[in-house]
Amino acid sequence: VLDFSYLADSRGNKPSLSIHDRDIKFLEPAFLDLEQKTGIYIDPYGTTRIYPAHQQILVDYLQGRSEDKIVEFVRLLKNAIREDEVLVADGD
């Protein structure tokens, strides 16, 4: 499972999203694109901070996809960008 949450969310009140291993495969190409453009890789088994500029790269790559989890992920990214929030990706 790869959990995405707001870095500043100490109370668990802000939006978050869990993506199971079977759905991560849909995001891997976007993660690789982000790595090629920035050197930042979202490791499904580690912890990564995703800053708003990096979030926008992911949105640009994933925009228009119709898989449910991708749509949810893009929605979370757009909210975080609008609120200028850093996301934390925490994998296991």
At which residue positions do the language-model features occur?
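Acidic (Asp/Glu-rich) sequence patches and key acidic residues
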Residues: 1-92
